[in-house]
Amino acid sequence: MAAAVAAAGAGEPQSPDELLPKGDAEKPEEELEEDDDEELDETLSERLWGLTEMFPERVRSAAGATFDLSLFVAQKMYRFSRAALWIGTTSFMILVLPVVFETEKLQMEQQQQLQQRQILLGPNTGLSGGMPGALPSLPGKI
C-alpha cells in the first residue's frame, strides 16, 4: 500500500487493481468454498428464528398471539365437529333409519301382492292397478 501512495505522489496513474485492497482476491477458491459451507451450517429453524429478529417485538408478539388464537379456534372447531357428527349420526340412525326400513318393507309387500295377483288372475290385472273386487278393464282399451 505504501508503494501505491508513493507512486501516487509521483503523478503516475494507478490501475484500479492497485487501489483496491487485496482481501479475498488472494485466497484460493477452495478456501472461499469452505467459508460458504461454514455459513450454511445453520438449520432451517435457526434461519427462520433469525429472520424474526428483523421485525419489532410488537409485531412478533401480535403474530404469536394470532397464531395461538388460530390454533385454539381450530382445536375447538375440530372438537365441536366431532361432537356434532356423532349427534347427527346417532340421531339419524335412531329417527330416520326405522322409517326408511318400514317404507322398504311396505314397498316389498306391495310388490309381492302385485306379483301374486298377476300369477293368480293373469297379466292384465297387474297393470290395471284397480281396487280389489272392481271389474277388470276391457281388453281392447287400456
From Swiss-Prot:
Modified residues (Phosphoserine): 15, 45
Modified positions (N-acetylalanine) in chain numbering: 2
Membrane topology annotation: Single-pass membrane protein
S-S pairs: none
Predominant place of localization: mitochondrion
Keywords: Acetylation, Membrane, Mitochondrion, Mitochondrion outer membrane, Phosphoprotein, Protein transport, Receptor, Translocation, Transmembrane, Transmembrane helix, Transport
Stretches the record annotates as TMD: 83-103
InterPro entries with a match to the protein in the record: Tom22
Pfam families recorded: Tom22
Topological domain spans for side Mitochondrial intermembrane: 104-142
Name of the protein in its database record: Mitochondrial import receptor subunit TOM22 homolog
Origin organism lineage: Eukaryota, Metazoa, Chordata, Craniata, Vertebrata
